[in-house]
C-alpha cells in the first residue's frame, strides 16, 4: 500500500504547453510526435479543438489550478510556425479569456527557419508571442541536408536577422553537435557562427539516435566519445567566453535570459498540456501529484478524444521524479522545495543523500544540495539511486 505524503503540497508556478503536430517533412533523427504535412493543415479546426481541450482540463483539474495564473506558454511541435499569426493570435486571446496570464508571462513559439519571413515574425509578436525558438541545428548546408532540414544556412541567418530586429523579448537558437561525420572544427565553427548572431539564449545539445527514427534504422557514423568530449569541452569554453552562462545540461543564456518555461519544468513546476501527445503535470493541495497525456494522432484528437492517460505519481516515485528534473539545473536545490513540492520529509532521501555525499556526487549545506562537477559526469548513476527499490 502506498503511504500518503505527510505534508500538504505547496502549489508551484503553472505553465501551459501546446503541441502543434504538423511539419513540412519528418527529420530522420526526430522522435517527437510530428506528422508530415499532407495538403492543407486544418488550422482553425485544430485551434477550436485545443480550446475545447483546455476548457475540459480547467474544469477537470480545477482543484489543482484554482486561481493560479499562467507564468509561461510554450507552443511546440512539429512546426508551429506553419500556423498563421491570425490563428495564433486567436488561440492566445481565447486562452487568456479562460485562465489569467501573469504580468510578465513568457510566450514562446517554435519556428523553423524555412517557414520564417519578416512579416510572419512581426505577426507573431502582434499575436502576443514574445519569444521565438528557432531550430537552426547547423550552419553547414551539407549537415543540414543529412539532418533532413528544409532550410539552408543562408535562410537560417536571415531568420535570425528577422528575430533580432523584431520587438521580441528574447529568442533562442537550437544547435546540435555530434552530427554525422562532424569534426571538432566543424562543430566549433557552427558554434562560432551562432555566437556571432548574438542570440540571448542558445540550446546546444548532442545528437542522439532515438528508437523508431530513420537514423535508428540506418545509423550514420557519429563522433566517438573522446571526440564528443573535446567538442563539449571546447564549445563550453567558447560559450562562456562569449558571456553565456550554462544553467542546464544543454542550455546557455545571457544573464536574465533563461527560458522561464523550461525552468518551470526542471524546478518540478506544474504545467497544463493541450494538443496531440502533449504531457502535463499537476499538483493538488491534498498531496496528490498527477501526470497525464493527450491522444497522439491528429485524427483521434480531432474526433474530440483528447485525454489519453492519467497516472498518480506515487510517494515512492517522487524523489526520482523531483531530482531527475532538479539535478539537470546547475543551481543549488533548496531542501524546503523538496518537502513542499513532493509532500515528503527530508528523511525520505537521507540514505541516498549520504551515499551521494560519500561518492562526492553532491555537496550539502543546511538549506541546499548541489551536484558537483564530478557528479555531473555520473548523473545517471546519481539519479538511479533515487529509484524505488
Predicted regions mapped to residue ranges:
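Short, Lys/Arg-rich nucleic-acid/phosphate-binding segment
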Residues: 252, 366-369
Amino acid at each position: 500500500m502506498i503511504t500518503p505524503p505527510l505534508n500538504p503540497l505547496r502549489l508551484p508556478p503553472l505553465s501551459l504547453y501546446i503541441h502543434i503536430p504538423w511539419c513540412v517533412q519528418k527529420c530522420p533523427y526526430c522522435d517527437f510526435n510530428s506528422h508530415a504535412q499532407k495538403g492543407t493543415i486544418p488550422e482553425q479546426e485544430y485551434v477550436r479543438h485545443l480550446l475545447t481541450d483546455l476548457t475540459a482540463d480547467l474544469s477537470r483539474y480545477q482543484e489543482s489550478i484554482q486561481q493560479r495564473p499562467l507564468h509561461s506558454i510554450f507552443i511546440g511541435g512539429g512546426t508551429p510556425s506553419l500556423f498563421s499569426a491570425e490563428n495564433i493570435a486567436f488561440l492566445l486571446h481565447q486562452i487568456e479569456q479562460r485562465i489569467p496570464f501573469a504580468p510578465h508571462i513568457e510566450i514562446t513559439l517554435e519556428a523553423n527557419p524555412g517557414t520564417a519571413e519578416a512579416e510572419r515574425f512581426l505577426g507573431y509578436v502582434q499575436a502576443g508571442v514574445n519569444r521565438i525558438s528557432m531550430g537552426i541545428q547547423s550552419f553547414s548546408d551539407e549537415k543540414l541536408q543529412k539532418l533532413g532540414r528544409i532550410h539552408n544556412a543562408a535562410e537560417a541567418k536571415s531568420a535570425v536577422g528577422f528575430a533580432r530586429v523584431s520587438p521580441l523579448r528574447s529568442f533562442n537558437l537550437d544547435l546540435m553537435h555530434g552530427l554525422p561525420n562532424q569534426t571538432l572544427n566543424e562543430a566549433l565553427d557552427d558554434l562560432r557562427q551562432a555566437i556571432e548572431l548574438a542570440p540571448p539564449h542558445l540550446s546546444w545539445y548532442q545528437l542522439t539516435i532515438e528508437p523508431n527514427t530513420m537514423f535508428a534504422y540506418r545509423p550514420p557514423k557519429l563522433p566517438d566519445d573522446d571526440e564528443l568530449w573535446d567538442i563539449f569541452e571546447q564549445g563550453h569554453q567558447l560559450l562562456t567566453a562569449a558571456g553565456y552562462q550554462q544553467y542546464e545540461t544543454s542550455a546557455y543564456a545571457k544573464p536574465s535570459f533563461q527560458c522561464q518555461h523550461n525552468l518551470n519544468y526542471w524546478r518540478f513546476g506544474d504545467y497544463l498540456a493541450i494538443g496531440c501527445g502533449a504531457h502535463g503535470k499537476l499538483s493538488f493541495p491534498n498531496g496528490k501529484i498527477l501526470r497525464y497525456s493527450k491522444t497522439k494522432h491528429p485524427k483521434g484528437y480531432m474526433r474530440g478524444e483528447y485525454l489519453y492517460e492519467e497516472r498518480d505519481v506515487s510517494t515512492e516515485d517522487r524523489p526520482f521524479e523531483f531530482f531527475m528534473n532538479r539535478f539537470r539545473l546547475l543551481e543549488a536545490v533548496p531542501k524546503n522545495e523538496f518537502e513542499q513540492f513532493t509532500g515528503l520529509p527530508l528523511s525520505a532521501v537521507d540514505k541516498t543523500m549520504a551515499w551521494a555525499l560519500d561518492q562526492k556526487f553532491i555537496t550539502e549545506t543546511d538549506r541546499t544540495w548541489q551536484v558537483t562537477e564530478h557528479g555531473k559526469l555520473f548523473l545517471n548513476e546519481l539519479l538511479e539511486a533515487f529509484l524505488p527499490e
